[in-house]
């Protein structure tokens, strides 16, 4: 641990912390340990492991962390293209207590000759980037590493993250960061350690300030070169120098002119002293000379000026968005004949419209969408209630609050992240995971418990020999985990009928299902919704439908299974589909939309069609109808959904869900 010293106590530059301070630090450490113990009871089971050597493998990480408890999954994150290690990974434990033990015992352990950093995994990026409890330490001695810094600052509270910045060779850059779980702990460390001596060097300890926020909160920038504009054409260099010379000695003064010698209306004045330049800016900015108001400020490089203008522009956009929050509406699925005036006419009964516009391409053709801004959020709410889904000309409108693209993408990403599966309990014996009607939850990979080696799955599920690639040797097919599972008595009756049918053969016979075990029954509750396959309307399927899984299985065809390329339903015109939706039960509406949407999505993203379709079905019906009618809108939404899926996959790499995905049999099941 680095030696903490008071500044200037003796000839050696400092002395050890006195007894009272040491007692106070010990008390703080005890409090921190208690807080950490309490956090462990409610804490996460997922750990982040950083500073991994490039040669560390998943198996090495597993072996290293197994000594602290039961490990559920491990993952070393790698580049998707080169498969090289990114220098970090994740470890998931069965219990929070095991994770807490690993954090305390394995943090800074050497793995392949390099000390690793272990901390709790924080999935929410807003929490990681919030800056709460984050402090900055600079002027560190080169000998202070991650472990020494952690030991020094752990006396003030539980540490979420601790890091010393290093160069490519591993040498300390002389500064680091420590993040506590609360601002109070961070402030305590700042109060006690700022200005103290660590290894005979006085350190600065203060709140962490984001790079983009450092200039406004830091010291005033010093400058000597002054920019002045809005000058009169008759003003000369000597007159300008005379005005600025009252504030100090100037080294240069020039008015910019064109090729003919005419003034461009601006110039530069350079002072010898920065304080004189600052006083000149404060005194002359906004003053009127020759009936013209001067602008006087610090001379900036082009890049600095562009950055400042960009920040001002973004701030103005944010203020405008905040001002119109809840009152600006987005309208989609507009008929091409709808103009700005017609759109205003339709929405005028609901309140005062401040702006109304139909979006058009460069040639003037309507894009089918627009915006309507009301004076109050209440008026906008009434408009949404009355106009969403209303038929205008020949199309149902989609009306919702307008959102920026970044906000909409963040919302979709947050929704998809919440649908990720939680850690599953360890398997007890061979089992299969079953799902109720509606399919597995959106975004969840299918996981089936694996039996002992060479064990043939228990009977009770039919086989899709045509659909499953990678048949077993000897013609034994992979089991179809999506075959409808009926009650045992009903299945026996159908099997007897099919065996008596001439030419029924193996195609018409279904194996008898066994009663699921209690372990399987516990896993049959739904965790979410995900569209799996387009299928026929359940009302057209003969026979019982209770306790059946939603699959593309046509009972009326004698037990045959649909081929991937065989049509499952005929396309329905949009107007007819909208009418059928209005008359259908709520539980059937999603299926009807999915039957029409899934084939279109599959053409764009065949590998992720199920997930993307499930995401799109979460939207309002009117918007889904618009996607069915507009290939351009569908392509844009599918692209946006794929971006969300990739972003979530990257952020949650190494989690338990990803580990389960790697064990999934989903690749062997054709949607």
Curated annotation (Swiss-Prot):
| Recorded phenotype for the gene knockout or disruption | Pab2 and pab8 double mutants show significant growth and development defects and more resistance to Turnip mosaic virus (TuMV).
The keyword Cytoplasm is assigned to this record: yes
User: Which Gene Ontology molecular function entries are recorded, alphabetically?
Assistant: mRNA binding
Give start and end of each RRM domain: 45-123, 133-210, 224-301, 327-404
Cystine links in this protein are: none
Q: Which biological processes are named by the entry's GO terms?
A: regulation of translation
Cellular component, GO annotation: cytosol; nucleus
Supply the induction statement.
By potyvirus TuMV infection.
Where is the protein situated, by its record's location annotation? Cytoplasm; Nucleus
**SUPFAM superfamilies this protein is in?**
PABC (PABP) domain (SSF63570), RNA-binding domain, RBD (SSF54928)
Q: What is its main location?
A: cytoplasm
**Residues of the PABC domain:** 573-650
The record's keywords, sorted A to Z, are: Cytoplasm, Host-virus interaction, Nucleus, Repeat, RNA-binding, Translation regulation
| UniProt biased composition (Low complexity) | 483-501, 508-525
Comment field (misc)? A.thaliana contains 8 PABP genes.
- Its biological function? Binds the poly(A) tail of mRNA. Appears to be an important mediator of the multiple roles of the poly(A) tail in mRNA biogenesis, stability and translation. During infection with potyvirus TuMV, acts as a potential integral component of the viral replicase complex that could play an important role in the regulation of potyviral RNA-dependent RNA polymerase (RdRp).
Similarity comment text for this entry: Belongs to the polyadenylate-binding protein type-1 family.
Q: Would you tell me the protein name for this molecule?
A: Polyadenylate-binding protein 8
